[in-house]
């Protein structure tokens, strides 16, 4: 038996149209329902397009492809929201309370008066066809424990495959494409950062879609902590795509009147292949007021040239060669501070080492500037070696649960940015070095994942991520011309959450041009090339031992 989905009330309908994309949303039985998300169309969509059959042994009313996927409305898949009040109010049924829309945006407030919750959802479709969506949950009752709040978007029946990325250190962004099968396919990160084996976004596409043609839909979450993407398909063939922050137990506990704002979501559509999808995202990001306006300086990072062997006279010879070759920026990497003669010690002691730089960094910084180049410096402010003056003085400043010390990674632990004293130490230490040496560029590394990431014994990945955002924002406030390069053992923290606070991503620690061609190509599926750090790799490559021609290595770095 075929049954129509009920029509919406007058005025409770949003038809967004911009950038060659149309997005149609209606309120059905009090719930916001996404009717259409694809290429722009003229006229009206036929009601027959939404008719669905009701099988025997099924609900007597149609379950609509709503934003709010709730069991109370007969949705049997994964829900939009999970939470409770000490086991109560675990089931919600939100209804639209306020609804506003224009050609390019909508704002909806939903309320569940029984559960005493409101949810504000807003979206804007820009001139490039990129839909930016936000969600904010407010608690109007007693203490509410939020476990999950996800974004969900329905997929066209044409979307029969998914594309995401996997990898490891020095081998990021390997594409994996698969058929969308019945069930729930999930990609999630539990590292306290996106990670090497994670995806910048999830893509659904037609089987025939290639770089130049075919339809594709994509989600990318603006968040640098734990997160997840998934595609779910039921037995009737209806599929949806989702993204959301992964919340650890107790990370979001809302008192009366408190709110949780989810990380923003970017939703993209293209009918001109994967390149069309990338082009739309690049145009959107380039239109930001924060996007770099000047040509990107040609940068020499000294890490693979010297590693921990800091010698001023040796470095000056390299600087001379860099100036003659047309470089515009020289970055001094790890090893300039404390007892940091290897990765075993000194991390966290952000004072210039008198052992290797007895007169400070002023001499080499001025030498570089006198050659007409900019001086940049490496930091890893979120981390600490157990063998360091900082850790010996403040062992309680790390992320931990009770007195349990987690496993080290590259011989280091993670400082707790939710601890105000630790946060102030990092901020003030970096600020002092930047001011003392007039530094306008830093490479900020992150070489350990977050495990047992507790603050006052409570899960703190969310607070740690927010602390990093606050730290970067404050550094840029104090140093107006500062540019930050985001690095995390290479490309393990490339995302749309941190992008407004940084000016470049280090794409991978692998500088082998053959490997880099793939890594850069797929990183550019979401991130514009001018924001992706590239180097002309050594010969032979330090990661692969492979010898490649200079022209190939140079062209790969340039393009």
Regions found by a protein language model. Name each.
Residues 60-94, 206-230, 268-290, 327-334, ...:
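Glycine-rich, aromatic-flanked loop segments that form ligand/cofactor-binding clefts
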Residues 94-96, 252-270:
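Short Pro-Gly-centered flexible turn/kink motifs
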Residues 293-428, 441:
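Aromatic-lined carbohydrate-binding/catalytic grooves of carbohydrate-active enzymes
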Residues 4-7, 12-24, 32-232:
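Polysaccharide-binding surfaces and accessory modules of carbohydrate-active proteins
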Residues 253, 261, 299, 329-331, ...:
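Structured core elements
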Residues 20, 135-137, 338, 353, ...:
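Active-site and adjacent substrate-binding regions of carbohydrate-active enzymes
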Residues 385-424, 465-559:
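Glycan-recognition surfaces
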Residues 2-13, 235-255, 481:
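Short acidic, Pro/Gly- and aromatic-enriched capping/linker segments at domain boundaries
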């Amino acid at each position: 038996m075929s049954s129509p989905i009920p029509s919406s009330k007058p005025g409770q309908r949003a038809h967004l149209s911009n950038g060659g994309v149309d997005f149609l949303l209606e309120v059905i039985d009090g719930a916001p329902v996404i009717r259409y998300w694809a290429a722009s169309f003229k006229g009206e969509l036929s009601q027959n397009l939404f008719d669905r059959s009701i099988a025997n042994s099924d609900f007597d009313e149609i379950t609509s492809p709503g934003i709010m996927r709730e069991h109370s409305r007969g949705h049997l898949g994964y829900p939009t929201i999970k939470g409770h009040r000490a086991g109560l109010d675990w089931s919600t049924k939100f209804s639209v309370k306020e609804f506003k829309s224009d050609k390019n945006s909508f704002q909806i407030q939903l309320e569940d008066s029984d559960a005493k919750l409101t949810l504000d959802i807003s979206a804007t479709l820009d001139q490039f066809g990129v839909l930016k969506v936000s969600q904010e949950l407010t608690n109007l009752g007693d203490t509410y424990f939020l476990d999950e709040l996800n974004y969900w978007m329905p997929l066209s029946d044409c979307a029969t495959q998914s594309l995401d990325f996997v990898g490891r250190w020095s081998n990021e962004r390997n594409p994996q494409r698969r058929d969308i099968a019945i069930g729930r396919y999930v990609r999630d990160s539990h590292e306290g950062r996106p990670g090497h084996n994670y995806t910048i976004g999830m893509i659904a596409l037609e089987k025939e879609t290639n770089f130049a043609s075919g339809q594709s839909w994509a989600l990318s979450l603006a968040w640098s902590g734990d997160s997840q993407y998934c595609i779910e398909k039921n037995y009737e063939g209806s599929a949806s795509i989702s993204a959301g922050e992964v919340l650890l137990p107790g990370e979001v506990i809302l008192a009366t009147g408190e709110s949780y704002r989810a990380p923003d979501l970017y939703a993209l559509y293209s009918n001109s292949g994967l390149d069309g999808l990338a082009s739309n995202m690049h145009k959107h990001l380039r239109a930001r007021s924060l996007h770099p306006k000047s040509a990107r300086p040609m940068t020499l990072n000294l890490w693979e040239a010297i590693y921990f062997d800091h010698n001023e006279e040796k470095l000056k010879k390299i600087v001379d060669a860099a100036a003659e070759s047309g470089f515009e920026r020289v970055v001094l990497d790890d090893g300039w501070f404390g007892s940091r003669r290897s990765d075993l010690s000194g991390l966290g002691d952000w004072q210039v080492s008198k052992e290797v730089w007895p007169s400070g960094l002023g001499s080499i910084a001025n030498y570089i500037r006198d050659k007409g180049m900019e001086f940049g410096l490496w930091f890893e402010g979120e981390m600490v070696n157990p063998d360091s003056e900082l850790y010996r003085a403040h062992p309680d400043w790390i992320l931990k649960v009770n007195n349990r010390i987690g496993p080290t990674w590259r011989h280091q632990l993670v400082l707790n940015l939710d601890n105000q004293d630790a946060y102030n130490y990092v901020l003030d230490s970096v600020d002092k070095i930047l001011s003392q040496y007039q530094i306008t560029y830093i490479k900020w590394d992150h070489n350990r994942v977050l495990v047992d990431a507790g603050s006052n014994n409570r899960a703190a990945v969310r607070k740690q991520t927010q602390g990093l955002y606050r730290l970067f924002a404050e550094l840029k406030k104090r140093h107006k011309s500062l540019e930050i390069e985001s690095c995390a053992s290479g490309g393990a923290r490339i995302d749309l959450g941190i992008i407004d606070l940084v000016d470049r991503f280090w794409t991978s620690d692998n500088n082998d041009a053959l490997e880099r061609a793939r890594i850069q190509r797929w990183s550019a599926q979401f991130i514009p090339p001018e924001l992706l750090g590239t180097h002309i790799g050594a010969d032979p490559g330090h990661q692969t031992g492979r010898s490649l021609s200079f022209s190939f290595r140079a062209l790969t770095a340039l393009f």
